[in-house]
């Protein structure tokens, strides 16, 4: 048997793919795949929905903004400045029209940002402003999104998808329990606010916890039952026979 070999010459050339690795995805628009390069990203914390009163002849103000220890915020703006190097004016014009066409008609949808692996935002595109620099052959777009103030985790608590784990802010905890007798379980919400929790059930299980006396859940009614999962550690008592899964998604002020 005879083999033929191809000579591999040594080289010191560094090869790079001229494809952006940072960007955002909204609707069917992926800034990386189109070829837009992110220059800057701005996501300041949102303004609080304040209720304050000033009383004559008293110092300071009375702040009634909080309820049950929780602060409430308005939407937040997330702004991207992205650039597209193109020497031909006609091509720059095409990309300007296309980014507006792709982003502005879309209603409230998920905004995925490579800067925040493990999270997504929910909102809509507020504006797209474009600057065309003929001298530099550079198209610059400033894209503003109007979003819910908190970011959502990509997956439900307990899914622990390895690629979405944020090790600096994460706990590993079971959320599904096999119930054969009365048992106490503890779940922790390490997010930034209380969140709604749903259930998935087999058999018949009764759950009691903070803020409610008890729900008797079956496969037929579990999808209609919800509770609020407060911040911190929460103790629940489960009884009956079957399995019960707590299904909630953290919301983070990041």
Regions found by a protein language model. Name each.
Residues 153-254:
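Intrinsically disordered, low-complexity segments enriched in serine, threonine, and glycine
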